[in-house]
Amino acid sequence: MGRFIFLSSGLLVVFLSLSGTGADQGCLPDWTLYEGYCYKVFKEKKTWADAEKFCKEQANGGHLVSLQSSEEVDFMVHQTFPILRYDFVWIGLSDFSRDCQWKWSDYSKLFYKAWNNEPNCFVCKTTDNQWLRRDCNRQQYFVCKSRVPR
């Protein structure tokens, strides 16, 4: 009986420590689940290419975040603002090949847009739904996104 209570208590502690992190839904620890994807804000600055490479190394299928709706942008702003305050984060949209073909790094289709014309990679403000083009070699904070593993 004592072993059963100890084991049950241990499982409860593990469950409570994982709840709310997305881990109970298949996300890595410290990643947040939203609409079938896992997200993580990184509070370190990298160039666009280095941030994209880093995201690929963090999670299977990971990339810089692609934003497909205003609701997803609102979710991301809700995640980034408490951590980064008034700043910008790299998103996965770029014209890295400089051929005027804007593409998401995860190869998803570009349906939703919120920008003005400037350089070749994009940041999103941490306070609202505004995208700005930036020089890809500039160092910025970033958000990674990956599908929930099946």
UniProtKB/Swiss-Prot annotation:
Cysteine disulfide partners in this protein: C27-C38, C55-C144, C121-C136
PROSITE patterns from the UniProt entry: C_TYPE_LECTIN_1, C_TYPE_LECTIN_2
Top-rank taxon, per record: Eukaryota
Pfam families in alphabetical order: Lectin_C (PF00059)
Miscellaneous remark of the record: Negative results: does not block the glycoprotein VI (GP6) and does not inhibit platelet activation induced by ADP-, and thrombin.
Function: Antagonist of the alpha-2 subunit of the integrin alpha-2/beta-1 (ITGA2/ITGB1) on human platelets and endothelial cells. This protein inhibits collagen-stimulated activation of human platelets in a dose-dependent manner. In addition, it antagonizes the binding of monoclonal antibodies against the alpha-2 subunit of integrin alpha-2/beta-1 to platelets and it coimmunoprecipitates with this integrin.
Protein name as annotated: Snaclec rhinocetin subunit beta
Species annotation: Bitis rhinoceros
